[in-house]
Amino acid sequence: MEIIMDIALNIGLKYKEEKTVAMNDTAKVFGSGAAEVFATPMMIGLMEAAAMNAVKSHLPEGYSTVGISVNIRHISATAVGKKVWAVAELVDMDRKRLVFKVEAFDEDKKIGEGKHERFIIDEQKFMSSLK
C-alpha cells in the first residue's frame, strides 16, 4: 500500500464497469467507422470509467483523477444488444500517477486489452489552472 496526501491505494485494486451496447455506442453513430458494432472510443471510455471508479471512493473529497494515457487494442467486434464490461486493475503507482491493466469483454469473449494511466488531481486547483 502506498500513501499519498492521506490517500491509501492498494496495488491489485479492481473495478468492473458494464453496459449493454446500444445504437448510440456504435462506430457508425460515433463516427469512428461504418459498422454498427461497439465503437473503439466507447470501449476505451468504458475502460476509463472502470479505472476512475476503482479509486474514486478512496480519494478525499475534492480530489479525482484524469486520464493521461491509453494504450489499447480492440481485438474483437461486439453487436448491438450484447452486454459488455471492462475490468480495471491498479498495477502500479508513482506518487499521483496510477497505472491500470484494463480488459474488456462481451458475453462471448475478450474484446479489448491494454494499459491506462490516470493522475490524481485536486479538482479546484486543476480547474483554476485552466482559466
Feature names for model-found ranges:
Residues 22-23, 31, 117-131:
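Surface-exposed, gly/pro-biased binding rims or lids
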Residues 34-42, 79, 99, 121:
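Residues at secondary-structure transition points
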Residues 72-107:
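Hydrophobic beta-sheet segments that form the core/acyl-binding groove
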